[in-house]
Amino acid sequence: MEEEDESRGKTEESGEDRGDGPPDRDPALSPSAFILRAIQQAVGSSLQGDLPNDKDGARCRGLRWRRCCRSPRSEPRSQESGAADTATVLDTAADSFLVELVSILDPPDTWVPSRLDLQPGESEDMLELVAEVRIGDRDPMPLPVPSLFPRLRAWRTGKTVSPQSHASRPACSRHLTLGTGDGGPAPPPAPSSASSSPSPSPSSSSPSPPPPPPPPPPPALPAPRFDIYDPFHPTDEAYSPPPAPEQKYDPFEPTGSNPSSSAGTPSPEEEEEEEEEEEEEGLSQSISRISETLAGIYDDNSLSQDFPGDDSPRREPPPPQTLGAPGTPPQADSTRAEGAPRRRVFVLGPEAEACHEGKVSVEVVTAGAPALSLPPLPPTDPEIEEGEIVQPEEEPRVAVSLFRAARPRQPPASVATLASVAAPAAPPASAPRAPEGDDFLSLHADSDGEGALQVDLGEPPAPPAADARWGGLDLRRKILTQRRERYRQRSASPGPPPARKKARRERQRSGDPAPPDSPSWEAKKHRSRERKLGSHSTARRRSRSRSRRRSRSRSADRRRGGHRSRSREKRRRRRRSASPPPAASSSSSSRRERHRGKRREGGKKKKKRSRSRAEKRSGDLEKLPASVPPSGSDRDSRRRGAVPPSIQDLTDHDLFAIKRTITVGRPDKAEPRAPSPAPAVSPKREVLYDSEGLSADERGGKSDKDRRRSGAASSSSSSREKGSRRKALDGDRGRDRDRSSKKTRPPKDSTPGSGPLPKAPPSSGSSSSSSSCSSRKVKLQSKVAVLIREGVSSTTPAKDSSSSGLGSIGVKFSRDRESRSPFLKPDERAPAEVAKVAPGSNKPKKTKAKAKAGAKKAKGTKGKTKPSKTRKKVRSGGSSTASGGPGSLKKSKADSCSQAASAKGTEETSWSGEERTTKAPSTPPPKVAPPPPALTPDSQTVDSSCKTPEVSFLPEEASEDTGVRVGAEEEEEEEEEEEEEEEQQPATTTATSTAAAAPSTAPSAGSTAGDSGAEDGPAARISQLPTLPPPMPWNLPAGVDCTTSGVLALTALLFKMEEANLASRAKAQELIQATNQILSHRKPSSTLGVTPAPVPTSLGLPPGPSSYLLPGSLPIGGCGSTPPTPTGLAPASDKREGSSSSEGRGDTDKYLKKLHTQERAVEEVKLAIKPYYQKKDITKEEYKDILRKAVHKICHSKSGEINPVKVSNLVRAYVQRYRYFRKHGRKPGDPPGPPRPPKEPGPPDKGGPGLPLPPL
């Protein structure tokens, strides 16, 4: 991270020094001269200074060329590109532009072909060409040649030379880094690039070594980078020929630089030729070409170049822009990226011109160095495309759409070759996408049918032309274009300042929407975008970009290991801590934090570790490195979460991982396009890979469901889901929340039966809840509901996504409730939470949406969360997160068991409402009314691994599966947040706990939950709150259905309630104690599925504890007798007390564990008994007795294990015994407890203390 930061800083400095900052630009220099100089210097320095430049070296895993190009319109802050790349790129891409640049820059001095030649595949890392063109003032780009040259030369000379780096960093926003997107072999400085390539790549773009050759070394390894092949982006093929300067680079100079360096250091002559051509054509043309090239490069390269090992906050902005303009550049980049995820991010956009000072930033990111994201242009284009990973509000990077006009420039044959190579190896999307490079405006992290994540760079203009290309290859672009169209349709009303995040996201996603706030665009617009409903298109684009980035980040994370996760975690924490301070900002930052938290959770769930690392790393990088380019404060603000980490967190690694793992069904994508106008439904096609059943219907309606399911069909790539989901969560959270809550929420409620909404997955962060049915936990392992939506309208993360079923992959990221609450409160509360609003407007929980509380938590749009009914067992993980909330989700402690798979969505909803409302622990009005219906724990085995006692089991009485415990355990940070929210929903929690305690009527639910849990278990959090069929809203006073409330309440409640609603808990304790006294003697205590209604749900918060409070024998749900009165739901500060007071179960964790064990035991016993019961070997009464006794025995076994074999043996012994008794006229019920079953003591070896046996 530091390395990335340094590189970034250096990049900024180089940009500023070279360009003297946007203000300091040399008026004397003509724009073309400026750009040429910048490019030349960048290339030269990149060649010599890739590794030499310490920061840039960090940036350039391999050599990285930085060119500072200033065009009248765009002033490339610093263009880093391998010499070969630059030459090739310049020659291929922007002949005139390059020629101008070359002429201005001293080609011989700047270009150091020797470096490239040095170690074509080894030293020099693959470089990713990231170009950021800021267009604003075209005129003097005071990129002082002298300053540029010295820096470039210094950089070339020594990898630690900071001059260029420094210049680049100050000018971070404007620096153009042309790197060999190809990640050609790092030049001799490769050591530095190598070191950074593994994980530093502070500057995602700079990390790309200026590899004159474009070897596709493995992203992590400078030389290996080109060895590492990106399955989705056959960069290897393109990269394999490192010496193909002209081939690598396409008509667009920025992109060409990347491929060129990969192909081989373009000779200065080539660059000069390009410069000449550029001068002839003029800066605008050159810029358009660059943008086109960038778009082309980005199309495939960016996606393909996910630096698994690179933390490239900087890179984050660029990676999304992977549209291949002609397809070659992206492919070339992609080709190189294959080996080493290399991101070429070119942000060139006339649209952003107004807001941007004329700046062209071309960043070449090494596969291993994602850190160097393009420095955001603070005032730059309002429409930061999704394609570009936009820095948070602080350093909005212009994801300006590359000039579509530049499109005429087709990649040269060599570039085309690269594209073709990349396309074959990579999903077809790569090659076809290239032609649409001009549309790279919005880069969405879409995955091709082949599973390659690709960024759509095309705007609406591109779709017709792109359609042919889109057929197999440009799906992303096509989707992106449609998104843009939708966004434009809706963008007119994007949004109020609250939409700041959204606005930013939208800008990133679609260059069009955010022009107005371009200056404050960084922070405010991002937030507004996040919130804006209208900015669905941009949200989608951003989601895509995010998912891609995230995917890459994940990939890198896997390669890098925990490094990224650690840094990301730190950054997230920083964000969390930082975001609260500003008041207005605090809500948006809270939202951001929430999203980040969710993302964090999502990362853990999806990649379990690798994703979590990627997320953390991405978040960190995006937070720190991403903001580094603009300034330290920018970085800090990013950390704070000025922009939801959705994009920020998506590093190249993440995107790469997403690209690799997430496959979006093209047909689905194409289909959703038609609905593109529909902001809520149409914009998103949510393909929740993990949670196919993720209430797509609920979220987007039944069509959504179908789409989602189709998406689920393609959801085989859970990795993608992870990345996409993260992105979607981040970017879509606000929009999706708003839109889903408002627009789709009613549909969701209307279609509670539909599978759980993706919302659950976001909340679960693992999208485990996304599975509409337990059967639908298709990709639960990824634990992330990847919403594949054409439009990533953040406001309608799940619902819209499902409705539109558009091809874009919106990744819903679980965020902390804090960050989510701003979104959740208004939309979710108002729309589908009327009933819940009564309990507390602040914690209005969408009845059905709340059922998806997990998703809501993750997504911040609980309303969006699948309805409780829909969500039943959707995704164990997702559902659980409802209560866990973003933080809870993150906790995948209970997640491992994913008992929450069938957790009630309603519970989730209640949670989400509180989450939204009560950010601060303000014991909100406890949701006194506990779910009266006794919910059987459904053998939703609470994860024993649950760290937090938040895991709640919500046996839904209606659906056997639905009552899966939501072991949504949030990380402690998030737990605190959750607890705060729980204060608001103490009653809900109680209800949920009660439901959990309620006899687990549906062992199958438990089983499904268990399955989900298996997938989710690895997930960071237990977002396993599947919405239970009961769509009962979490009305605080009314009391939520035990089924829905149990899971969520237990999850969030156990921890949050404990801390936030102690008073409520005390009351709950009293109630539980009373119930305990009554029921503690009854072994079928909490799992008495028979008594679903009388659950002491009155303790909204205590429910979780109450379940646990039961000494294990007291069934919370079972004690249906306990009135659902808001007993002590009022925040009695004894929440914790309640749990501890109940039979010394002071430890909520213990209770949760016991409940979990008991539920699992019930599930196992039911499974074992079923055959006998079906054969009528035993009667119903005997069945109940055996179930109760067996569960009791298992729970009290010394081993504490639940061994299915032992359980079956025990059950068989009981059945035989009962049969024997029946034969001999003795009553089977006579023997108290398991009457001498063969394996009495350890039959199931359920170590759970005498949990109340839930007799069925």
Curated annotation (Swiss-Prot):
Residue ranges with Pro residues bias: 207-222, 922-935, 1244-1256
Residues recorded with modification Phosphothreonine: 328, 663, 923, 936, 948
Gene Ontology biological process terms, A to Z: mRNA processing; RNA splicing; transcription by RNA polymerase II
Keyword 4Fe-4S in record: no
Positions with biased composition (Acidic residues): 268-282, 382-393, 969-984
Annotated Low complexity bias: 192-206, 412-424, 752-775, 793-804, 985-1017
Pfam entry (one): SCAF11-like_C
Entry keyword set: Isopeptide bond, mRNA processing, mRNA splicing, Nucleus, Phosphoprotein, Repeat, RNA-binding, Ubl conjugation
GO CC annotations on file: nucleus
Feature: compositional bias, Polar residues: 255-265, 938-947
Modified residues (Phosphoserine): 240, 442, 447, 491, 493, 510, 518, 520, 577, 579, 676, 682, 691, 695, 819, 821, 876, 883, 910, 912, 939
Biased composition (Basic residues): 478-489, 538-553, 560-577, 592-611, 843-875
Positions of region (Disordered): 1-33, 158-343, 371-395, 408-1030, 1112-1152, 1221-1256
Keyword Cytoplasm listed: no
Molecular function in Gene Ontology: protein domain specific binding; RNA binding; RNA polymerase II C-terminal domain binding
Region feature (Necessary for interaction with the CTD domain of POLR2A): 1131-1256
Residues with the Phosphotyrosine modification: 689
Cell location: Nucleus
Cross-link (Glycyl lysine isopeptide (Lys-Gly) (interchain with G-Cter in SUMO2)): 812
Basic and acidic residues bias: start-end ranges: 7-27, 227-236, 612-623, 696-709, 719-741, 813-831, 1133-1152
Family: Belongs to the splicing factor SR family.
PANTHER family for this protein: SPLICING FACTOR, ARGININE/SERINE-RICH 19 (PTHR47013), SPLICING FACTOR, ARGININE_SERINE-RICH 19 (PTHR47013:SF1)
Function: May function in pre-mRNA splicing.
Subunit structure and binding partners: Interacts with POLR2A.
Protein name per Swiss-Prot or TrEMBL: Splicing factor, arginine/serine-rich 19
